[in-house]
Curated annotation (Swiss-Prot):
Family assignment from sequence similarity: Belongs to the 6-phosphogluconate dehydrogenase family.
Subunit text: Homodimer.
Chain residues that bind NADP(+): 10-15, 33-35, 77-79, 105
Tissues of expression: Highly expressed in inflorescence, lowly expressed in root and embryos and almost absent in leaves.
Function: Catalyzes the oxidative decarboxylation of 6-phosphogluconate to ribulose 5-phosphate and CO(2), with concomitant reduction of NADP to NADPH.
Top-level taxon: Eukaryota
Organism annotation: Oryza sativa subsp. japonica (Rice)
Enzyme class: oxidoreductase
Catalyses which reaction(s): 6-phospho-D-gluconate + NADP(+) = D-ribulose 5-phosphate + CO2 + NADPH
Name the record gives this protein: 6-phosphogluconate dehydrogenase, decarboxylating 1
Residues holding substrate: 105, 131-133, 189-190, 194, 264, 291, 450, 456
Lineage: Eukaryota, Viridiplantae, Streptophyta, Embryophyta, Tracheophyta
GO molecular function: NADP binding; phosphogluconate dehydrogenase (decarboxylating) activity
Subcellular location: Cytoplasm
Length: 480
């Protein structure tokens, strides 16, 4: 006999927390995990956290049969083969019209393949991005479901209550679009997250290495920044990090953390997609490259011995001015990073015919997710003003903000260069802006070179058509 409204398979911390969130919102939920101890652990947590209606099952048949028809099962398992294995386990007991939702960070084409395979079996399928980490899953994530619209309608009432709630814009969930669009949008969200984190780390590096700010001063600076236009989850937690003392030694914990950044692959996927779509995303690419370089810890230690010396300019620094300049540089760079992410999504939407609403994406990212920020409200309004906006940089408000901040931005990048401090994200953002704002680039020389050695032809600025010049013959004749 059916006892629950929905099921969830995969009870690592994210799965457990999402199940408890669903139950807490008034929806009885069945839970299943291949390792049965996780089932018992989740049920016990439900009791401790308020006798929540969570029902555990140790075998897939009982689990599926406990859910009311048409059945909806969310999977939260590792991307790739584990997803296919879980689908096979569940599908053996599901009936026509039932629905499977993959809530993991899956490659969008895998979602489209699975949706097609499930459709052939009479099952519905959704790929749903879930952002917010463990805390978000428990208390309200940002949700990005894409795939079968019929499947979305099955679960819309649950998602609207489970998602993060933002007072001025509602639940942080919307139907993203067809196919693998939900997973694709979550992937790019993560790429933007890479950019955000890199830019913040560069702001920290300049303030510490050039401005000589202490951790206590950095905590105060980031706390103050979190009251203005940079107000965001990542700025907030950065301020928190600078306040934490090392409980296993002296000083602050942040200074004891190894400078080697991990990653799970979504940032790399984003950069690969940008390349496939011919979309410039240098800030996001720089953030990925920085993670690769951070992984070369042993090589960097040896290189530091080879390139010994003081690269600082030894010029006096006005600390207050530096803090303000870095704040402005961070904000301007952030605009460029988000512009690149949105352009990747727009290009993919056009290629796949998804008709994605970029303003709506900004809205559902305002709460619950890792990149949640007051800044996203500005992005939503920009796309509300012009849904066909070519680039966030040319929105009138953002354009004015960048113009107002570019002097500080340039000062920070130059100061970093002169002091041997790398700012790949800020530098890439500035180069992106400078390239995008110019009506003529030195690409004419590159195209001339291509025509010289490869007869790739070129276009002219003064007449239509495609042209080829015998550059070598002309140059050789001129030298004779």
């Amino acid at each position: 006999m059916a006892v629950t409204r929905i099921g969830l398979a995969g009870l690592a911390v994210m799965g457990q927390n999402l199940a408890l969130n669903i139950a807490e919102k008034g929806f009885p939920i069945s839970v299943y995990n291949r390792t049965t101890s996780k089932v018992d652990e989740t049920v016990q947590r439900a009791k401790v956290e308020g006798n929540l209606p969570v029902y555990g099952f140790h075998d897939p048949a009982s689990f599926v049969n406990s859910i009311q028809k048409p059945r909806v099962v969310i999977m939260l398992v590792k991307a790739g083969a584990p997803v296919d294995q879980t689908i096979a386990t569940l599908a053996a007991h599901l009936e026509q019209g039932d629905c499977i939702i993959d809530g993991g960070n899956e490659w969008y084409e895998n979602t489209e393949r699975r949706e097609k395979a499930m459709e052939e079996r009479g099952l519905l399928y959704l790929g749903m991005g879930v952002s917010g980490g463990e805390e978000g899953a428990r208390n309200g994530p940002s949700l990005m479901p894409g795939g079968s619209f019929e499947a979305y309608k099955y679960i819309e009432d649950i998602l609207l209550k489970v998602a993060a709630q933002v007072p001025d814009s509602g639940p942080c969930v919307t139907y993203i679009g067809k196919g693998g669009s939900g997973n694709f949008v979550k992937m790019v969200h993560n790429g933007i997250e890479y950019g955000d984190m890199q830019l913040i780390s560069e702001a920290y590096d300049v303030l510490k290495s050039v401005g000589k700010l202490t951790n206590s001063e950095l905590q105060q600076v980031f706390s103050e920044w979190n009251k203005g236009e940079l107000l965001s989850f990542l700025i907030e937690i950065t301020a928190d990090i600078f306040s934490i003392k090392d409980d296993q030694g002296s000083g602050h914990l942040v200074d004891k953390v190894l400078d080697k950044t991990g990653m799970k692959g979504t940032g790399k996927w984003t950069v690969q997609q940008a390349a496939e779509l011919s979309v410039a995303a240098p800030t996001i690419e720089a953030s990925l490259d920085s993670r690769f370089l951070s992984g070369l810890k042993d090589e960097r230690v040896e290189a530091a011995k080879v390139f010994q010396g003081d690269f600082s300019s030894n010029l006096p620094v006005d600390k207050a001015q530096l803090i303000e300049d870095v704040r402005q540089a961070l904000y301007a760079s952030k605009i460029c990073s988000y512009a690149q992410g949105m352009n990747i999504i727009k290009a993919k939407s056009m290629e796949k015919g998804w008709s994605l609403n970029l303003g709506e994406l900004a809205r559902i990212w305002k709460g619950g997710c890792i990149i949640r920020a007051i800044f996203l409200d500005r992005i939503k309004k920009a796309y509300d003003r012009n849904s066909d906006l070519a680039n966030l940089l040319v929105d009138p408000e953002f354009a004015q903000e960048i113009m107002d901040r570019q002097a500080a931005w340039r000062r920070v990048v130059c100061l970093a260069i002169n002091n041997g401090v790398s700012t790949p994200g800020m530098s890439a953002s500035l180069a992106y802006f400078d390239s995008y704002r110019r009506d003529r680039l030195p690409a004419n020389l590159v195209q001339a070179q291509r025509d010289y050695f490869g007869a790739h032809t070129y276009e002219r600025v003064d007449m239509p058509g495609s042209f080829h010049t015998e550059w070598f013959k002309i140059a050789r004749a001129a030298k004779m």
